[in-house]
């Protein structure tokens, strides 16, 4: 059993491994104040060959017993995930998913359970920290670490990981994920703030993200795990060249179509034509061809935004879509409004 701890935001943050879920590829107990979460990660030994995406499942659950409650009424067991649990699962998924090596298609699970809640220290941000650390100390190839913090602002002062009662009084609340070098995800809400205040809040968050990552590395160094080799990039230069030759300048023509449905139809028509043209030379490689086409579209769209400052529907980067608001859309339903 290995423990490391450090004071973060006026409370003790503790990481522990080797005591619970020892059969998992990686597991860690994260304690902050008196809030305790368990994160366990596992991965299949063999990759999926029938898919062209990474099958990652992140599941976050807040057990009733964590708050000292027993489910009452007719249903005595835990119900399906709540909206908050689903959103926290996504909040954890977003910063960790891009850090898996390209081509890694082994089914991977990240299971996060809140074991104890003190009612004040929010467990959601520690789900991402625990997932990062559990992946680090597992044999699963992953290019972390990352850390997540919550930043609040009360009376002009920034607060790291504000308590549940403090959040109600915050003018700004951000959840920020990042690595040693940069910020990779931001989510939050605020009253109207200046750009300077938002930038300062992100700098404040990143400073403490680095501090948490240092503690993650301390535990990682103590565990000394041997990682599985990263999968070799399955690059078929001949196939890429063939697809690229079929695409030509057609991509730019399609992404310049302003009507969304027309653009989608043109894209699907192009895909069908390329698959038909290449099916003899590259049989049973439909997934690979589709993946190459999607990558080419993504690259072209990003290039158009960065070089021309224009999106696919013609809007500039500082413009928003037109919106039509129809109040009292339903005559007998209170507060019904249609936004289109």
Question: What does each model-identified segment do?
Answer:
Residues 1-2, 8-11, 25, 53, ...:
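Alpha/propeptide regions of enzymes that mature by internal proteolysis
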